[in-house]
Amino acid sequence: MAAGSPEPYPQEAPEGPCTFCVIATGEEPRDVRYEDEELLAFRNRLIWAPVMLLVVPKQHMTQQEFWISDLFAKAAKLAVRLGEEDCPDGYRILTNFGRDALQTQFHGHLHVIGGIALGLYLSHRLTAWPQVPPPG
């Protein structure tokens, strides 16, 4: 690693059990929207919008492993279905990768957020549209 480069972000929780693994096994209370042998969708305890759902694989895997897995397409379809059911006026499906994206859970997951006008995603940081140079 080059001098001055930030440490790579961890791929798993540094200590203690994985929060989403504990939730997936039912050891923690959860408000389930969908469950089968591979996936679990539940309401997030953190509430920044009226609808905040998490879609997680029951088997522990990192965000990167989840996105390249065969299970991801099934999870994405579920996220879309839940978004359509719970947020008929619009919703966001997103994932955070790493420290700069504020990833705090190192178990792969999708967020389904809506139930309110969400606005410009980075409006708190943007003062003008960024100028992106043309490729080449």
Descriptions of predicted regions:
Residues 1-136:
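HIT superfamily nucleotide-processing domains
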